[in-house]
Amino acid sequence: MENPHEQVQANILSRIIGNVKRLNESVAILNQELVTINNRNKNLEIMGAICDNYHSSVQFNLEATNNKKPPL
């Protein structure tokens, strides 16, 4: 005699497996997008560091030559 709930449990398990597969696909796509965003952010981080270094260099040179003036 078969378990009367076996078919219901099999259907539920099948739905769970399908949902987990779709979830895994979505997470993989999300991870790819995050990698892309992180790569773009690296470029912005480098540009910010360049600007900070330039600002520090300009401030140092203005102070060294006594050409630094107060802000307007």
Swiss-Prot record:
Compartments where found: Nucleus; Cytoplasm, Cytoskeleton, Spindle; Chromosome, Centromere, Kinetochore
InterPro entries, per database record: DASH_Dad4
UniProt feature coiled coil, ranges: 19-47
GO cellular component: cytoplasm; DASH complex; microtubule; mitotic spindle
UniProt keyword list: Acetylation, Cell cycle, Cell division, Centromere, Chromosome, Chromosome partition, Coiled coil, Cytoplasm, Cytoskeleton, Kinetochore, Microtubule, Mitosis, Nucleus
Positions bearing N-acetylmethionine: M1
Biological process (GO), any one: protein transport along microtubule to mitotic spindle pole body
Pfam families registered for this protein in UniProt: DASH_Dad4 (PF08650)
Remaining remarks: Present with 967 molecules/cell in log phase SD medium.
Family: Belongs to the DASH complex DAD4 family.
Entry-linked PANTHER family: DASH COMPLEX SUBUNIT DAD4
Description of how the protein assembles with itself and partners: Component of the DASH complex consisting of ASK1, DAD1, DAD2, DAD3, DAD4, DAM1, DUO1, HSK3, SPC19 and SPC34, with a stoichiometry of one copy of each subunit per complex. Multiple DASH complexes oligomerize to form a ring that encircles spindle microtubules and organizes the rod-like NDC80 complexes of the outer kinetochore. DASH complex oligomerization strengthens microtubule attachments. On cytoplasmic microtubules, DASH complexes appear to form patches instead of rings.
Protein role: Component of the DASH complex that connects microtubules with kinetochores and couples microtubule depolymerisation to chromosome movement; it is involved in retrieving kinetochores to the spindle poles before their re-orientation on the spindle in early mitosis and allows microtubule depolymerization to pull chromosomes apart and resist detachment during anaphase.
Name of the protein this chain belongs to: DASH complex subunit DAD4
Species for this entry: Saccharomyces cerevisiae (strain ATCC 204508 / S288c)
Gene of this entry: DAD4
